[in-house]
């Protein structure tokens, strides 16, 4: 999960470089890191959507400037080169298993019903944003069934139980509250950034939104197909963390340009909540280990 996450972030970085200079060298670098991301874990295939978006946008932009066959040929060569490099690197193992064992390329191991099975609970309850499970301290695969609550809790404490008595109960409440506030403001920032008339780097923000949406859709689809406690873990949504942070600070930057005092106040509050969240979360974990 961590290696795939790193390679996905590197792919987005190389994609931005490619957009600024769509040379063959940058195409090769982009294709290699994309292929490695997919090879590490099929979740890396989510990058196909933002890559497709940027490729098409770049081609259309160039076509509007220079409407001739050379432009078409140039980008056909670039897209072909990207596919010839990235697809073999990303799918060689899946194709090997398909040939040797007739295993489908997108195969997911079927798991028999166990204690952590959540398919016997209605989807409405599992997606309820106001679940009582938030009142429980930690995410447990054999007990929890609500997806939003599980994501919030596992993003802080993983799938383990830590100290929960005395002062720890207060710290836990503060940490969860900070996490909820930051999550809400992240969605507010996404909305404001995308619908603000004058917003810097809007193209890249749309690219990140594509990855954000498809990651969430893929995550929900997995939880419907594989309704188990461990399917709800935040590790399957790791890309949302840097994407959300980019939207938050891009929004704050735009607010500062229009209202310096308001922007600085929001900036201070976001940093304060993040700092409190990090300090208290690590305090709970480290003191539990000790």
Language model segments and positions:
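Multi-pass, polyprenyl lipid-linked donor-dependent membrane glycosyltransferases
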Residues: 1-15, 40, 46-47
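Membrane-interface transmembrane helices that cradle and orient dolichyl/undecaprenyl
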Residues: 11-26, 37, 59-61
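Perimembrane helix-loop-helix junctions
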Residues: 14-17, 47-84, 100
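Membrane-interface alpha helices of multi-pass inner-membrane proteins
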Residues: 26-42, 48
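Transmembrane alpha-helix segments characteristic
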Residues: 32, 87, 198-223
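Signature aromatic-anchored transmembrane alpha helix within multi-pass, membrane-resident enzymes
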Residues: 32, 52, 79-87, 252-290
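Hydrophobic alpha-helical membrane-interfacial segments at the cytosolic entry of transmembrane helices
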Residues: 32-33, 67-94, 112-117, 208-210, ...
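Hydrophobic, aromatic-rich transmembrane alpha-helices
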Residues: 150-202, 209, 254
């Amino acid at each position: 999960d961590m290696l795939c996450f790193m390679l996905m972030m590197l792919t987005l970085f190389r994609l931005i470089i490619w957009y600024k200079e769509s040379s063959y060298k940058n195409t090769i670098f982009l294709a290699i890191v994309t292929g490695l991301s997919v090879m590490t874990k099929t979740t890396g295939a989510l990058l196909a959507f933002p890559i497709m978006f940027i490729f098409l946008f770049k081609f259309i932009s160039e076509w509007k400037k220079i409407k001739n066959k050379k432009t078409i040929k140039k980008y056909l060569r670039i897209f072909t080169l990207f596919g010839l490099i990235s697809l073999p690197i990303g799918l060689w193992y899946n194709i090997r298993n398909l040939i040797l064992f007739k295993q489908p390329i997108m195969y997911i191991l079927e798991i028999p019903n166990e204690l952590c099975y959540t398919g016997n609970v209605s989807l409405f309850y599992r997606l309820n944003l106001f679940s009582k499970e938030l009142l429980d301290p930690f995410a447990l695969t054999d007990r929890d069934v609500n997806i939003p609550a599980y994501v919030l809790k596992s993003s802080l404490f993983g799938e383990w139980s830590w100290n929960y008595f005395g002062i720890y109960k207060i710290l836990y409440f503060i940490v969860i509250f900070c996490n909820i506030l930051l999550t809400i403001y992240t969605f507010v920032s996404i909305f404001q950034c995308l619908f603000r008339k004058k917003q810097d780097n809007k193209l890249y923000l749309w690219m990140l939104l594509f990855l954000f949406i498809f990651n969430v859709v893929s995550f929900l689809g997995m939880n419907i197909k594989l309704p188990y406690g461990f399917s709800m873990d935040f590790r399957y949504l790791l890309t949302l963390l840097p994407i959300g942070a980019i939207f938050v600070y891009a929004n704050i930057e735009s607010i500062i340009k229009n209202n310096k005092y308001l922007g600085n106040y929001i900036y201070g509050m976001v940093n304060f909540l993040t700092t409190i969240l990090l300090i208290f979360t690590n305090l709970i974990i480290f003191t539990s280990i000790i």
